């Protein structure tokens, strides 16, 4: 009985007594220069329970994503500065590609003095008044100094612009001297014309693979000083015969200029007439419509732009603004130089 009462008393005293505080254990110290890694890192919960992580049922603020930037005209995003795209030489700012400039070049023309020039549009065949079956060669030319013109039938040309007649026995070359002057008229002497009916069509109409031209005219300017014989200026005009509606006509296929022992081929430039005739009509650049045109597009030979627009065109397109053919070269021509 006494033991039972003592046990009850002891239990009651334990209930009234305070619970002793838990023993504080020192934190586990890791040795220096030691690292602890998880053998298998746990996977993160894609749908975490924010109630357990934040006491008091206080949810974190919603995660805000960066706003989408507007589209540009190329329908490409403007990425932030720290984007994942790497710079590239063909990309502007790492966002969209740009085309490299065209490969054609922009050059300035070099002035070459031509002392004698045959106007090829005036070259024609006229009937001989004394011999209707024969035709005479006629043309107009300009000369800044005296010289000599040679008309050769069925001629061949060497590398130094020398003509040789292949039918010299029946059609000898015709040579005459001229003086200085513009707009001079040449007409072959009567009785020395050519009878085209005496030749076959294979001889009159030049084949592609032959070097013989049915007609060639050599205009040579001779300086007055004897010591300047090495600076002779020569122009060769190569002519072929064509037949239209039964009538035989002549057509200039090429003009060669020989200056200082160098060979040049003369080509027409379309649009240059409007820039040198003194008229203000039609001489403006076709791009800006304000500056005078001074640049020619090759190989189509359209003189249609000013030098400023031609330089800007190199970085935009490689097509001629007139005929839309591909551009290989831009040639700037200074009319005052």
UniProtKB/Swiss-Prot annotation:
The keyword Phosphoprotein does not apply. GO terms for molecular function: ubiquitin protein ligase activity; ubiquitin-protein transferase activity; zinc ion binding. One of its GO terms (biological process) is protein ubiquitination. Keywords: Lipoprotein, Metal-binding, Myristate, Transferase, Ubl conjugation pathway, Zinc, Zinc-finger. A zinc finger (RING-type) spans 285-324. Its EC number is 2.3.2.27. Pathway: Protein modification; protein ubiquitination. InterPro entries: LOG2-like_mRING_C3HC5, MGRN1/RNF157-like, Znf_RING, Znf_RING/FYVE/PHD. PROSITE patterns: ZF_RING_2. Residues 139-255 are annotated as: DAR2 domain. Myristoylated (in vitro). It catalyses: S-ubiquitinyl-[E2 ubiquitin-conjugating enzyme]-L-cysteine + [acceptor protein]-L-lysine = [E2 ubiquitin-conjugating enzyme]-L-cysteine + N(6)-ubiquitinyl-[acceptor protein]-L-lysine. The RING-type zinc finger domain mediates binding to an E2 ubiquitin-conjugating enzyme. This is Probable E3 ubiquitin-protein ligase LUL1. It comes from Arabidopsis thaliana. The lineage of its organism: Eukaryota, Viridiplantae, Streptophyta, Embryophyta, Tracheophyta.
């Amino acid at each position: 009985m006494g033991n039972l009462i003592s046990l009850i008393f002891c239990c009651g005293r334990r209930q009234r007594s305070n619970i002793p505080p838990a023993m504080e254990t020192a934190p586990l110290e890791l040795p220096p220069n030691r690292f602890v890694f998880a053998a298998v890192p746990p996977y993160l919960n894609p749908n975490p329970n924010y109630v357990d992580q934040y006491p008091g049922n206080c949810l974190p603020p919603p995660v805000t994503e960066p706003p989408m930037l507007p589209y540009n005209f190329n329908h490409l995003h403007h990425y932030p500065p720290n984007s994942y795209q790497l710079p590239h030489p063909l990309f502007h700012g790492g966002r969209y590609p740009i085309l490299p400039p065209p490969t054609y070049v922009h050059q300035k023309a070099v002035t070459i003095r031509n002392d004698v020039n045959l106007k090829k549009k005036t070259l024609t065949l006229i009937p001989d008044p004394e011999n209707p079956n024969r035709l005479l060669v006629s043309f107009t030319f300009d000369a800044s100094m005296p010289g000599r013109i040679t008309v050769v039938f069925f001629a061949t040309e060497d590398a130094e612009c020398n003509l040789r007649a292949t039918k010299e026995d029946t059609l000898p070359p015709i040579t005459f001297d001229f003086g200085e002057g513009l707009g001079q008229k040449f007409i072959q002497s009567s009785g020395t014309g050519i009878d085209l009916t005496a030749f076959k069509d294979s001889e009159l109409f030049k084949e592609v693979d032959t070097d013989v031209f049915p007609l060639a005219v050599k205009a040579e300017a001779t300086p007055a000083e004897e010591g300047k014989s090495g600076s002779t200026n020569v122009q060769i005009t190569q002519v072929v015969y064509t037949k239209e509606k039964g009538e035989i006509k002549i057509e200039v296929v090429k003009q060669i200029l020989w200056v200082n022992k160098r060979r040049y081929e003369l080509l027409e430039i379309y649009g240059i007439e409007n820039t040198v005739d003194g008229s203000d009509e039609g001489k403006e650049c076709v791009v800006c419509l304000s500056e005078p045109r001074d640049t020619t597009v090759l190989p189509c030979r359209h003189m249609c732009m000013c030098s400023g627009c031609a330089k800007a065109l190199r970085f935009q397109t490689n097509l001629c603004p007139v005929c839309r053919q591909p551009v290989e070269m831009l040639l700037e021509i200074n009319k005052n130089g």
